[in-house]
Swiss-Prot record:
The modification Phosphothreonine is found at T61. GO terms for cellular component: cytoplasm; nuclear body; nucleus. It comes from the Eukaryota. Expressed in hypocotyl cells of etiolated plants. Homodimer and heterodimer with FHL. Interacts with underphosphorylated PHYA, especially upon far-red (FR) light illumination. Binds to LAF1 and HFR1. Forms PHYA/FHY1/HFR1 complex in darkness but dissociates from PHYA and HFR1 in response to continuous FR light (FRc). It is found in: Nucleus; Cytoplasm. Key regulator of far red / red (FR/R) spectrum-specific responses essential for the adaption to changing light conditions (e.g. de-etiolation), essentially by regulating PHYA shuttling from the cytoplasm to the nucleus and by directly regulating the expression of some target genes, depending on light conditions and phosphorylation status. Binds chromatin at target genes promoters, especially in FR light conditions. Can activate transcription of different genes, some being in a phytochrome A (PHYA)-dependent and other in a PHYA-independent manners. A motif (Nuclear export sequence (NES)) lies at residues 54-57. Induction: Activated by FHY3 and FAR1 under far-red light (FR); HY5 prevents this activation. Down-regulated by FR, red (R) and blue (B) lights. Accumulates in dark (D)-grown but not in R and FR-grown hypocotyl cells. Repressed in etiolated plants transferred to FR conditions in a FHY3-dependent manner. Inhibited by light. Repressed by PHYA-mediated phosphorylation in R illumination; the phosphorylated form is a substrate for ubiquitin/proteasome-mediated degradation. One of its GO terms (biological process) is photomorphogenesis. GO terms for molecular function: nuclear import signal receptor activity; protein homodimerization activity. This is Protein FAR-RED ELONGATED HYPOCOTYL 1.
């Protein structure tokens, strides 16, 4: 296989104006080389190895045709005299090692701490706390709260419930009493929307 050649001219890799770039054609599995112009401000992948751990994971995984080695060191610099196949192997192993490092970081004891902190909150929401935490008076209030509310509503009577309902627009109340239905004409839905949107336009 042809080797990647880069003219160093005693310059740092980030100061090189051009380098050879590989393209892998997935349909033919052929390696091609192109010369790519790079500004002096850009960095090579080897210069970015420290920054790669801070970036989010890439959306693509290792190439299917290239074996991903867990024993290779992805942070080592790539020698410019390697062949193109070794370049592909090293770049894919860097991606795989970053994936493995991120998975190891995410599976720590922090997850357990978060589960414990949310457990008491979820118990409070769904009412699955231990009954030992409550006094007897609090338990009676919780159990009989619904019954007390129903008794109070029955004592007030249905007529005092005010048979007025507010429409979804929130502006007009509709009486459900039979005597008031004959006095006022209820607007249609179209009229209600016209009135509502006309007030919004003002």
């Amino acid at each position: 296989m042809p080797e990647v050649e880069v003219d160093n001219n005693n310059e740092k890799p980030s100061e090189i104006n051009s380098f050879h770039h590989m393209i892998i054609s997935s349909s033919k599995n052929v390696l091609k080389m192109e010369e790519v112009e790079v500004s002096k401000k850009r960095k090579f992948q080897t210069d970015q190895s420290d920054e790669l751990s801070l970036l989010p994971l890439s959306k693509h995984t290792c190439f299917a045709n290239v074996a991903c080695s867990e024993n290779t060191n992805g942070n080592s610099e790539i020698d410019t005299e390697y062949s193109m196949s070794s370049y592909v192997n090293s770049t894919t192993s860097m991606e795989c090692n970053n994936d493995i490092e991120m998975k190891e970081e995410s599976s720590g004891s922090c997850g357990e701490d978060k589960m414990i902190s949310f457990e008491s909150h979820l118990d409070y929401i769904y009412g699955t706390q231990n009954l030992e935490d409550f006094s007897e008076k609090v338990i009676e209030n919780i159990l009989y709260l619904d019954e007390q509310e129903e008794e109070e509503e029955d004592a007030k009577g249905c007529s005092s419930n005010a048979a007025k309902f507010v429409l979804s627009s929130g502006r007009w109340t509709v009486n459900q009493d039979d005597s008031t239905l004959h006095e006022t004409k209820k607007p249609t839905i179209d009229q209600e929307f016209e009135q509502y949107f006309s007030t919004l336009m003002l």
